[in-house]
Structures are given as structure tokens and as C-alpha cells.
Regions:
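Hydrophobic ligand-binding cavity/cleft-lining segments
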Residues: 1-39
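Short, surface-exposed coil-to-beta transition loops
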Residues: 6, 65-69, 88-92
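Residue-level recognition of well-ordered beta-strand positions that form the cores
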Residues: 8-10, 56, 71-73, 84, ...
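A short, structured loop/turn motif at beta-sheet edges
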Residues: 15-16, 47-49, 73-78, 94-104
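Hydrophobic pocket/interface hotspot
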Residues: 18-19, 28, 53-55, 72, ...
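Glycine-rich portal/gate segments that line the openings of hydrophobic small-molecule binding cavities
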Residues: 40-84
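Beta-strand/loop substructures that line and gate deep hydrophobic ligand-binding cavities in soluble
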Residues: 80-126, 130-131
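Short, highly charged C-terminal tails/helix-capping segments
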Residues: 134-138
Length: 138
């Protein structure tokens, strides 16, 4: 990876639940957006090595949106997923079981060049924090 950004969060739920909520499209549409003026109207995933994922993120007023999509390169069940986005950037998500009811997620991603590193770190963390709140409430 080239000059990656790393973010992490601790979630008070067991690793198997965190894993399922993170990769199951029926849950992804509920949390995969940075702020309340965004939403994720569509999430598709062929969750296997070589499988494709495609998540649509949009402003609720439909004034702007984009697809977050790519391919899954490697899966170690309940441990990590390595993938690459359509623009070639690499993403890794690690799931560390702290105890039976606590899981740490670490996301490592290559930044794109259009936005500052800090803006990307804040945006990705906002989505990860929304995930954290969602999985702890459901």
C-alpha cells in the first residue's frame, strides 16, 4: 500500500455479529454514509474472494452521489478482508476479537488524490462511527 491511512474503533459486540453487519448488504444500507444528509440506497456484494461489491452513496436530495465499488481479494473469516477499489486503491479491514463481547475494527486504506488526507480520514471515520452506533443498537 502507498502511504495508507489507518482508522480504528472498538465495538461492544461479538466479532461474528460485527463481521455480519459489516458485510451483509441488508445492514450496509442502514449505516454506510457519513452524515444524516446522506444515505446508501443500494448495496450489492458477492462476498467471496474475487467477488465484486458495489455500494451507492448519495445525498438524500439526489444532488450528488457516487459508487464505492471494487473486488474482494482475500478473506480470512472473522479476521480480515483485503480488497481493491475500481480505481486500484487497496483497502484492508481487520477484525480483532478483544473478548467475547468486544471487537476492534481497523481499516487501512490508500487515499485518493482529489481530497486531503484529513478530509478522507474524517469521512471514513464518520462512516465507521455510524457503523459502530448501528451495530451496538441492533
Amino acid at each position: 500500500m502507498t502511504d495508507p491511512i489507518t482508522i480504528k474503533i472498538t465495538i461492544l459486540q461479538p466479532v461474528h455479529k460485527v463481521w455480519d453487519y459489516f458485510y451483509n448488504p441488508k445492514h450496509i444500507v442502514k449505516w454506510n454514509f457519513p452524515t444524516t444528509n446522506w444515505h446508501c440506497p443500494k448495496a450489492e456484494s458477492d462476498f467471496q474472494e474475487g467477488g465484486r461489491f458495489n455500494y451507492r452513496l448519495e445525498y438524500k436530495d439526489k444532488s450528488f452521489g457516487y459508487n464505492f465499488s471494487g473486488y474482494i481479494d482475500e478473506i480470512e473469516v472473522l479476521k480480515y478482508v483485503k480488497s481493491h477499489l475500481d480505481d486500484g486503491r487497496k483497502v484492508e479491514v481487520h477484525f480483532n476479537k478483544i473478548d467475547d463481547n468486544t471487537t476492534e475494527i481497523i481499516e487501512i486504506f490508500e487515499p485518493e488524490i482529489q481530497n486531503s488526507r484529513e478530509m478522507q480520514r474524517v469521512g471514513w471515520y464518520a462512516i465507521l462511527d455510524r457503523f459502530h452506533k448501528y451495530v451496538e443498537k441492533h
